[in-house]
Amino acid sequence: MRMSCNGCRVLRKGCSEDCSIRPCLAWIKSPEAQANATVFLAKFYGRAGLMNLINAGPNHLRPGIFRSLLHEACGRIVNPIYGSVGLLWSGNWQLCQDAVEAVMKGEPVKEIATDAATIGQGPPLKIYDIRHISKDDNSAAAATGSTDLKLAKTRRAKRVSTVAIQAESEGKSDEASHDSSLSHQSEIVAAHEGESKESESNVSEVLAFSPPAVKGSGEIKLDLTLRLEPVSRAYHVVPVKKRRIGVFGTCQKESTCKTELML
């Protein structure tokens, strides 16, 4: 019967033939150091997180992944700001090695002071540090963002204006068609009224016959005049609608006839 590895034993999990932790501990000689390193990483990354990180790589790379995770965790505890990369860059990699050895022995890791961690411990390229982003970049990003917002607002305003113009043009066309229909109807009414007025004027302009004058030769003379002269006040004016045209003729003798045309 095969015994479980030191990593699975401290994690209290079953160890099988294809265990992913067993090959990761092959470079550590002492069983106690293997157990201490596994417990330290399980506390730093979490048990499930540690297993996921190890299983993310192939079998031949898992020992290197375990060692890299151990050095990164120790470097982050020693220098919380720059981690193991800052210790390597500043020439203090020995501090990270000492922290790894302390973990394997089960001893606590010593953290450097905050002032020492911030002065000369990180790489000179400040673009990789989120605390040293230049204000120009921020202003440029803000400017680009503001221009994008302005463009979006102008496009939206243009769309709204085009829609409003279309609606206004449609309303004007409807009003124009309505006005045209009303004007057409008013023209018809005006034409009808004009015809009635013309008919009334035609009736008023009826020829008026004056009493015929008989000459001595026996001929009848008719005096025809248009009703354009001012009407005398002595005569009674009859309304146009009540006017009737009538012809009366009387003959006293064979040579004398009297014809009257009355309205």
Curated annotation (Swiss-Prot):
GO biological process, one term: cellular response to hypoxia
Tissue expression from the record: Expressed in young shoots, roots, stems, leaves and flowers.
UniProt xrefs under InterPro entries: LOB, LOBD
Domain LOB: 3-109
Comp. bias intervals (Basic and acidic residues): 169-178, 190-200
Pfam families linked to this entry: LOB
Name of the molecule in the record: LOB domain-containing protein 41
Originating species: Arabidopsis thaliana
Encoding gene, per UniProt annotation: LBD41
